[in-house]
Amino acid sequence: MRLIAENLGGERGGEAVFSGVGFALDQGQALVVTGPNGSGKSTLLRIIAGLLPKAEGRLLLENGGDDFPSIASACHYLGHQNAMKTALSVVENLRFWRDFNGRGDSGVEEALDTVGLGGVGHLPFGYLSTGQRRRAAIAKLLVSHRPLWLLDEPTAGLDKASEARFAGLMAGHCAGGGMIVAATHLPLGIEGAELRMGVAG
């Protein structure tokens, strides 16, 4: 499987944010997108996820097979918002995302244990602290089983121990043949190529 971007351009509010972006990402690889605020990091991820239209260029997924015929079917996007219902329990939220992504055999409790939230699955999501909410959102990645993780500032709200745990999860995902595109202004603790946005020329 290979994700390819050629001469991509993005807009926000009708104004060009970036242009000429290109990269190729193979299974087992990560791409870390850096740059100042307003340089288009989030816009790029949303374009890859299919949440925003691209202004120009080409974006395609090669060799996804029958399981992943498109980028949308292959990716799970973790944005600034955790995309969890505050009134539902943590387990109910994760079951929704597991079923929505067609992976009904995934272990929700196991995912919670992996992110250090074992024992809180029965609580309403709204009861959790900021860091716990982010870890619960990270657990969505584990129950969705999508090969392409699109991560926008994924460690926001995490303490150092949780950051280290997540770095291990990302490394494990890539070691298993997964791919990651992560936008960040903080070190993520993973090996990968860097794409710096907002650089003249």
Curated annotation (Swiss-Prot):
Listed SUPFAM superfamilies: P-loop containing nucleoside triphosphate hydrolases
ATP-binding found in the keyword field: yes
Residues the record lists as binding ATP: G35, P36, N37, G38, S39, G40, K41, S42
InterPro entries xrefs: AAA+_ATPase, ABC_transporter-like_ATP-bd, ABC_transptr_haem_export_CcmA, P-loop_NTPase
Family matches, as Pfam families: ABC_tran
Ranges for domain ABC transporter: 3-200
Function of the protein: Part of the ABC transporter complex CcmAB involved in the biogenesis of c-type cytochromes; once thought to export heme, this seems not to be the case, but its exact role is uncertain. Responsible for energy coupling to the transport system.
Name of the molecule in the record: Cytochrome c biogenesis ATP-binding export protein CcmA
